[in-house]
C-alpha cells in the first residue's frame, strides 16, 4: 500500500513540487520513498511495505526501463499473473505484485486492467509511446485525484497531494457550489467530482491515457445483473461459501502481521471464519467495545471462541470534538458520516498490533443487507398506492418515530417513497438530509442542479427494483461514502484494509442471484446467512443488522453543543453563503426539519463550517 503522486508537463516549477507532494501523503506509506523523473514526467510514491519487504521498492521498471510504474494497492492474483508472464518470456527482478503491472502492460496495453483482481490506483509512464497511463480498481477502493494545469496534468492519492503543484502554478481553487449542494444531500461529495472546481477523482472501473495534453478516460468494467443463475438455493449457498473462501484466502497474502476487524455482524464473522480456516489459532481478531445497547463485543467474543482465534477487545473512548477536528484534517473534503470519528480511532488501535486488516465492508451492497432492500424487493407490488394515501401513511408512522432504525421510522420512509420516481425514492429511503424542496426554500448560492440527477445516472433499464437499489448504492453511497471513510481512516494510521466481500468475481456472482435468494421471507442477505448458519453462532446469522451507530443526537446536545452554536450561530458563519439564516436558526432551535431527524443536517453543516474555516486558514498562509 502506498501513496502516489506525479506531474506530466513542461513547467519545471510544477514538476519540482513532487517531493513536497509526497510529504503531504507520507502517512500512506512511511516505510520507503522512490521517484521517477524523465523528460516531461515526474512521479513518485511513499510505500507501506506489505509484500516483498526488501525487494518491493518503487518505481518498478520493465527490462529496458522504457516503462515505469508507481502503484497504490494490492494485486491479489499476482502470482498467477507472474507465472503467465514468465511463460511469455518476461524477466522479473522482484517477487512483488508491483512488477507484474509493467510486464502486463507490455503484454496487453490498456486492457491489462481486465486481468487484475485487487484494489489499485497506479500510474505508468510509457516512454515508448510518450504517454501517461492511469488506472483505478473496479469498486474504487483506492483513490486517485487529478487536475489539469494548462497543457500538463498532476495526480495524487489524496487531494492534499495536488496542492503543492497548484501553488507552484499560481492557482487558487474555488469551492464548487454544486459539490456543496450535493454534499448537503448525501453527506459526502459524490465522485468523480470533488469539493473543488477543476479537481476530479478518476472514476472507479476506468483507465485514462494522457498524451499530447489530452486526457482520455475509458470504462473497462460495469456490473452485470443478468442472466440470473440457474443454481438452486442450496447450490447458491455452496457457491457463495466457495467464492468467499477463495477471496479471503487471496487476501491473506502478506509479509507483515495481519488481522480481521470482527463485529457481531454476519459479514465480518464470515470473513473471520474463512480466515481461521487458513490461519487457525494464529489469526488475530479485533473488536471495538462501545458500551450501550448497540455494543456487539459479546457476540463477537462468541464467534472468536467458536473459531479458536486470538481476540482483542479494544475499548473505544471517544472525544467528539477532538475526533471531529481530526476528520476535517484528514479527509480533505467535507465528510458528514459521523462514524468516521470512531473509524479513525479504531484504525489507530488496530495499527498498534497489525499492518493489514480484513473487514466485512461491502457485504450489504453485494448481498443486499440493508432493510431498504426489503422495500425495494416489494415496491413493484405496492406502487399502486396513490401518493396522498402513501403520504398519510408516512405521516402516521413518522409521527411515532423519527429514528431511521426503528420499525416505524423504516415504515414511514418506505411509505414516503412508494409512489415516487426511482431517483426521488432512492434519496427518500437513504437520506434525512437536504432535499429538493429544501433547496428551493433555503439555498442562497448560485443555481445548482438537482441531486436526483446523480441517481438518474445510475438507473439501468431492464433490472429489478432490488438490483437497481444495489447499483445506485454502489455508485453513490459505497463509492463516495463507505470506501472513502475506510481508506482515509486506515491510511491516516498507515494501516491497510482489505475487503474480501468486494471481490468483483464474488460480487458479479451475487448480483446474478434471483431477488428471492438475497431477500427471502422478509429477511435481507438471506443466502449469505444460510450459507454460514451451520458454522457461526445463531445470534450472528439470525440477528438484525445494527451497524456502527453513533449517538449523534447526544453529541449535538452535549459535547458538540458549544461548538455547534458558536460556529453555526455566528452571523459570520461561512455556511450562510450557501443556506439562509432561517434554516440555520430553525435547525438550532429545533423548529426546522420537524418531519425527520435534523441531527444529520446539523452535523453536516458543522463539518462544512469547520472545513471552510480550515480552507480559509490554509489560503491565508499561502
Predicted regions and their residues:
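Residues that scaffold the ATP/ADP-binding catalytic core of kinase and kinase-like folds
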Residues: 84, 165, 366-369, 509
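Hydrophobic alpha-helix feature that most strongly marks membrane-spanning transmembrane helices
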Residues: 185, 252, 305, 329-332, ...
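Cysteine-centered catalytic environments shared across enzyme families
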Residues: 1-331, 343, 347, 533-534, ...
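Adenosyl-5′-phosphate
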Residues: 1-4, 20, 167-172, 197-204, ...
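Acceptor-substrate binding/catalytic loop of class I
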Residues: 333-337
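Active-site adenylate/phosphate-handling loop in enzymes that bind or generate adenylated species
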Residues: 138, 345-404, 482-506
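Short secondary-structure boundary/capping segments
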Residues: 328-329, 371-378, 620-622
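Acceptor-binding helix/loop patch of EC 2.4 sugar-transfer enzymes
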Residues: 159, 379, 529-530
Amino acid at each position: 500500500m502506498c501513496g502516489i503522486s506525479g506531474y506530466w508537463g513542461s513547467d519545471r516549477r510544477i514538476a519540482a513540487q513532487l517531493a513536497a507532494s509526497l510529504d503531504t501523503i507520507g502517512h500512506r506509506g512511511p516505510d520507503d520513498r522512490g521517484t521517477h523523473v524523465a523528460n516531461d514526467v515526474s512521479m513518485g510514491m511513499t510505500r507501506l511495505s506489505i509484500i516483498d519487504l526488501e525487494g518491493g521498492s518503487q518505481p518498478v521498471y520493465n527490462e529496458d526501463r522504457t516503462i515505469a510504474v508507481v502503484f497504490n494497492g494490492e494485486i491479489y492474483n499476482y502470482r498467477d499473473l507472474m507465472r503467465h508472464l514468465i511463460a511469455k518470456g518476461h524477466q522479473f527482478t522482484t517477487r512483488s505484485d508491483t512488477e507484474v503491472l509493467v510486464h502486463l502492460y507490455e503484454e496487453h496495453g490498456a486492457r491489462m486492467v481486465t486481468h487484475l483482481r485487487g484494489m489499485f490506483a497506479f500510474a505508468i509512464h510509457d516512454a515508448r509511446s510518450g504517454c501517461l497511463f492511469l488506472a483505478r480498481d473496479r469498486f474504487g477502493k483506492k483513490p486517485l485525484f487529478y487536475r489539469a494545469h494548462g497543457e500538463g496534468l498532476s495526480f495524487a492519492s489524496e487531494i492534499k497531494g495536488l496542492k503543492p503543484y497548484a501553488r507552484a502554478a499560481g492557482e487558487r481553487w474555488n469551492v464548487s457550489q454544486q459539490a456543496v449542494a450535493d454534499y448537503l444531500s448525501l453527506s459526502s461529495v459524490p465522485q468523480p467530482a470533488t469539493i473543488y472546481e477543476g479537481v476530479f477523482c478518476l472514476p472507479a472501473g476506468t483507465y485514462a491515457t494522457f498524451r499530447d495534453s489530452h486526457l482520455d478516460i475509458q470504462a473497462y468494467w460495469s456490473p452485470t445483473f443478468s442472466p440470473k443463475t440457474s443454481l438452486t438455493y442450496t447450490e447458491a449457498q455452496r457457491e457463495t461459501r466457495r467464492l468467499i473462501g477463495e477471496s479471503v484466502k487471496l487476501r491473506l497474502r502478506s509479509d507483515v502481521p495481519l488481522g480481521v476487524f470482527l463485529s457481531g455482524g454476519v459479514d465480518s464473522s464470515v470473513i473471520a471464519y474463512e480466515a481461521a480456516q487458513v490461519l487457525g489459532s494464529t489469526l488475530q481478531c479485533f473488536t471495538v467495545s462501545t458500551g450501550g445497547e448497540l455494543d456487539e463485543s459479546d457476540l463477537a467474543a462468541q464467534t472468536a471462541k467458536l473459531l479458536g482465534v486470538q481476540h482483542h477487545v479494544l475499548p473505544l473512548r471517544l472525544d467528539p470534538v477532538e475526533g471531529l477536528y481530526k476528520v476535517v484534517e484528514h479527509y480533505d473534503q467535507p465528510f458528514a458520516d459521523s462514524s468516521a470519528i470512531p473509524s479513525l480511532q479504531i484504525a489507530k488501535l488496530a495499527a498498534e498490533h497489525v499492518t493489514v486488516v480484513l473487514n466485512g465492508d461491502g457485504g450489504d451492497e453485494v448481498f443486499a443487507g440493508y432493510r431498504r432492500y426489503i422495500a425495494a424487493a416489494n415496491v413493484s407490488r405496492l406502487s399502486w398506492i396513490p401518493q396522498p394515501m402513501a403520504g398519510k401513511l408516512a405521516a402516521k408512522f413518522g409521527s411515532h418515530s423519527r429514528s431511521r432504525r426503528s420499525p416505524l421510522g423504516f415504515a414511514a420512509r418506505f411509505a414516503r417513497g412508494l409512489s415516487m420516481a426511482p431517483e426521488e425514492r432512492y434519496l427518500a429511503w437513504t437520506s434525512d438530509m437536504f432535499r429538493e424542496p429544501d433547496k428551493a426554500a433555503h439555498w442562497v448560492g448560485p443555481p445548482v442542479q438537482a441531486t436526483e440527477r446523480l441517481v438518474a445516472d445510475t438507473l439501468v433499464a431492464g433490472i429489478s427494483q432490488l438490483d437497481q437499489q444495489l447499483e445506485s448504492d454502489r455508485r453513490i453511497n459505497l463509492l463516495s461514502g463507505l470506501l472513502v471513510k475506510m481508506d482515509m481512516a486506515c491510511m491516516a494510521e498507515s494501516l491497510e484494509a482489505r475487503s474480501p466481500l468486494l471481490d468483483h468475481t464474488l460480487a458479479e456472482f451475487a448480483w446474478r442471484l434471483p431477488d428471492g435468494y438475497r431477500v427471502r421471507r422478509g429477511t435481507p442477505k438471506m443466502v449469505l446467512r444460510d450459507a454460514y448458519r451451520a458454522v457461526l453462532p445463531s445470534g450472528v446469522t439470525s440477528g438484525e443488522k445494527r451497524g456502527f451507530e453513533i449517538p449523534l443526537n447526544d453529541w449535538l446536545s452535549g459535547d458538540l453543543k458549544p461548538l455547534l452554536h458558536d460556529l453555526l450561530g455566528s452571523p459570520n458563519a461561512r455556511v450562510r453563503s450557501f443556506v439562509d439564516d432561517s434554516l440555520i436558526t430553525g435547525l438550532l432551535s429545533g423548529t426546522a426539519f420537524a418531519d425527520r431527524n435534523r441531527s444529520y443536517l446539523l452535523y453536516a453543516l458543522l463539518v462544512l463550517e469547520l472545513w471552510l474555516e480550515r480552507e480559509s486558514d490554509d489560503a491565508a498562509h499561502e
